């Protein structure tokens, strides 16, 4: 009864090896996962997604190796590399049924991805937090010409200063390499790489009430997260949060 579903086995096995007095740890294995993205998750990722887009499940198998290094000065360094096989991964493309070319839909394809990831984290006296994330990925699709809107390289930096329990300042720059997409005529286009630099300050009045101010895209760059949707060059936001 109903649609016929394919039965799948998704294996997972991970081995972790501590070495050198636990300063270095090596982890390797296979991790499989099944995912059915919600409309809310997709809407946050792409606010211009059509509510009529067909959402399907997907699964991945990740074969990886990871090395952790923790220094005596409280610096965490993590290097990970691997190979992912994706079944029915989703990608965004313009919805041909949208007359103004201002909405997106989902297309699906199987993928094979080679990737490398570097993470650094450092904390000084619980006042300064510094973290860096670098990701390189080479995504090969089966039927699609390219992996739409998927960059080959991403970099994220976070610097946060906690003056005390109430006040903190954050500096958050990021970089993303160019991506490929389809225009309304079905032709391949490239969206240029982007640099986004943000500043934020937060003040906790008490455990329930806090105030914030954010200054986004201070690099004053006009970039496109999605086709036909340019960013604002500078965005200032201020407000308050209250937890009930």
Segments the model singles out, each with a brief description of its role:
Residues 2-244:
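Exposed, low-structure sequence patches enriched in small/polar residues
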